[in-house]
Amino acid sequence: MKQPEITWSLMHPTPLDPDYVRKLVKKASEYRVDSFEICGQCHSPYGGLDGLIDYREYPDAFASWDKDKVAENQRRLNDILAISHAAGKAVYLWHREVMLPPGLLKDIPELLDSDGEFDLTGDAFASLIRYKLAKTFESVPDLDGIVLTLTEADYSAIHNSDTRKYPPEKVVSFIIGIFASELEKRGRRFIMRSFGSIAEDYECILAGAEALEGRHQFEIETKITPYDFDPFLSVNPFLRKSPGFTLSAECESVGEFMGQGNMPFEHVYKIVGYVREGQAAGVDRFVIRIDRRGNCIFDLYEINYYAYARALEDDKITAAGIRREWQEKHYPEQYRAGFIELDRLGWEMVCKTYFIDGQVLFHGNYCMKYLKAGFIFALFAAGKHTLANGRGIWSILTAKETPGRAAILKEKDRAVMLADQGLALLKKLDPPSDDHRWRLWRNAVVVTRAVRELVRCISAYFDDMDAGKADCPQLKAQVAASLAEFDRLAGHKVEIVKREFVNGMEHRMKELNRSIEELVLEPLAAICGELEAEFAAESAARRKFLPGCRDGIIIGGLSDDWRIVRFMHASHALLYNGLPSRWAGNRVFPNGFIEMELVRGNKLVIHGVTDETRKFTLVCNGKRIPAEFDEKGKFSLILPSGPEKVTVRLEKNGKVYPQFYAALTRNE
């Protein structure tokens, strides 16, 4: 079997660090490694190409830009290139589009169209891409290539609301074509990541790339699991060879959704399966992430990376064989049986901590915004409901039903028990104090308890709401108890930091090696505290909007979360004027929508916010209707007789994203 290229993917997502690369170059001598990809601070304004350019040709952007930060990035990347090249490793830098420094829209207003959306096929954007590439190679001339991503950026490249004006596949071809041609001129490698948060992302990106067959040669890099590194997801159906292009598979070893290197997470069995899937797809290059937020696999459970290396080297070796090899080499005989048991316990414990019945609990930052975005509150709904309405959320297993609050609490109790069991076993074994397991299992005892407190508070919210207790006595008591537990776990009073809400992608600047208190306790304590305000707001909205209705939904409320169809990052919910609300769209997902099914009445009523716009688009049973709130934020539509259920979809109409409170039907 032909051996694929092996790339280590580094610094996810942390500042450029030459000393770290020096360390990895030494480690690479123990394995076959051909090249490096560098993520860097990709979720910040200073990631990718933008962090290497001072924009001095554009006065407003130049004035807003941190020139010292840019100079430091240039110096660090040039050092990294020198270190890597001396070891014979090529370096490919991650970049996202569309990213803009503050002020650049004043310098180049032509970047936006008449609808206030990004002009994705205009000359101004094409010139800007060429400018970014030219300036990058002026400052880092030895860079070997670029890895481009078209999602999770300041502006959407594939989700604009007018697909006739900006057909996604043509937009992708337009952008890729510029990158490919400019890099070909310079003799550099171009790699296109097909990563997306919904199936439509993959379809559009792959179609746009494949349309360039015969005109350009580049590589398509696709994740080994669809969307993100979730062990409960199936094989990625988009991991396929496109005619005329090479294929790379992006893999992961630390556990982005499994503790990010802060929890024990041996998963050799899964890794061997991923390698075999990639080999079956004809992958030319395996890209393996070896760190997360400053936690490197070689300081942790290196067995995971060893599993990739051995599975790629030997197509007959099994997970059991790899484990046996590693254990015999690296687990001292007096600890071996115990370490093997800890590996087994860690897998189950982590899965029961960071997932609810197989659904990802935390996306991005641990905050209320992403719990609402990720369909998490839908899992706590009373009774048995299908999760089919979570079809726009990549991490939801839509064939399942809501597990029930009792089952969720039981799952978290078991996670705590497993963490306690693991730490007790480690204490009994008593390996040297510098063994990495000490930190991971001590973390596990804290994290499992913190997550359990969050789940207890959410469950109390739903219990009180279901019982109609407006003063939420169970929730208040549980929040008080949970905050006390957070303080106990921290050893002092936990600081609760309020996060600024962004309707779109926030720039994450501090991603490096945060403490468990900062990473877990502080944000989870904040969420628990916010639940009381959420309860009061939802109760107020129900009293204000729903009396006398035939059927009604509080669009941004937690209790009705399971009834709202939306894309993961497209229609964020927040409290506004003391009421739960939800936007339809943002500049990352201008085509964002809110879709619901209501029992039919003879009138449909929509309530919303009029501060920024009264206009929106209503799609009622497939019929598009330009709609507008009255001065009180109310819109009504007479419904004809028809099927028992009416489907309602809300979208933007114009430049401004509309914000909604409630949708209901009445018989009048």
Residue positions per predicted region:
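N-terminal carbohydrate-binding accessory modules
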Residues: 1-3
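Catalytic-core regions of glycoside hydrolase
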Residues: 6-14, 19-25, 29, 34, ...
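A structural motif corresponding to the C-terminal lobe/cap of the Radical SAM core domain
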Residues: 62-63
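Substrate-binding cleft and catalytic face of glycoside hydrolase catalytic domains
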Residues: 79-116
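Catalytic domains of carbohydrate-active enzymes that cleave complex glycans
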Residues: 303, 310-587
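Extracytoplasmic
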Residues: 537-668
